[in-house]
Swiss-Prot record:
Assembly and oligomerization: Monomer.
Reactions it catalyzes: cytidine(2498) in 23S rRNA + S-adenosyl-L-methionine = 2'-O-methylcytidine(2498) in 23S rRNA + S-adenosyl-L-homocysteine + H(+)
Disulfide bonds: none
Name of the protein described by the UniProt record: Ribosomal RNA large subunit methyltransferase M
Enzyme class: transferase
Keyword presence, Transferase: yes
Provenance organism: Salmonella dublin (strain CT_02021853)
Gene responsible for this protein: rlmM
Amino acid sequence: MNKVVLLCRPGFEKECAAEITDKAGKREIFGFARVKENAGYVIYECYQPEDGEKLISELPFSSLIFARQWFVVGELLQHLPPEDRITPIVGMLQGVVEKGGELRVEIADTNESKELMKFCRKFTVPLRAALRDAGVLTNYETPKRPVVHVFFIAPGCCYTGYSFAHNNSPFYMGIPRLKFPSDAPSRSTLKLEEALHVFIPEDEWDERLANGMYAVDLGACPGGWTYQLVKRNMWVYSVDNGPMAQSLMDTGQVTWLREDGFRYRPNRNNISWMVCDMVEKPAKVTALMAQWLVNGWCRETIFNLKLPMKKRYEEVSHNLAYLQAQLDEHGVNAQIQARQLYHDREEVTVHVRRLWAAVGGRRDER
């Protein structure tokens, strides 16, 4: 199997293709990307027959920015007979996947494909039973085995393949299913909530998103991101010249600082989180984030970078490289991840976690 399907936001196929071509090439897994505008997916076709599995095994999925999900596939199955779509699919997967732990029958995130969603849900149950009978799936779901993917691009037309549970998105179609909280000040709250699900393992939430932590929200008005921090019982300094939602102020957990987020400097040294969703040029935001991290003003940060109209992958890569260079120069060891989230539009969300730093002659364990 030499093809890898990458699901992405419709309209960002070129960025997804540029990224996978770049990062696969750096691992000497060469191929070319098949791109269809606004399709919501890209197919990276490797030149060597076994390189598809090698790619999804060796390249960390967490290192990808524009892909929501990925899986290796074989040839396209076309003209599936309406009276029996299951048999050809089972035949394609037998001998390819043995004892998969989960089945996902998926589509691209486009209006055209959404017409297939109802069919996919109904089709999953009988297909799962047939795959279990054939030994392609285990008799029970398990996260320790590969995930089997059946990806419909049109009625009676699908790719079949698999991904590795330890190196994929745990979410169906790569999209966390979140509900907008009715008491949140703005829909932007879903961006930060999704970022927390994507970047922080669930079993680490109690430690890294703990009650009583101190946090800063730069460019906070009206409080969509502050809302997520308050919901997790943090004390929040919300920095913005614009007003905060009264419902947040009434909690007693929010201190509104009427200042410019680019000029604000914290006056305490125990800030766990800094979040930022300001409409500004990516380079300016990245420089500010580097300043916070280099100076140890926070332990973790999540921030958004607004994208230009052209060369968006190059722009993000340049800013992430600058951030990494600044951290390296100042002896800060950190983990950096970036992802275009489902709730992002013309932007990407970046998460940075300081691990430790040598600052002013002392080792600062973080």
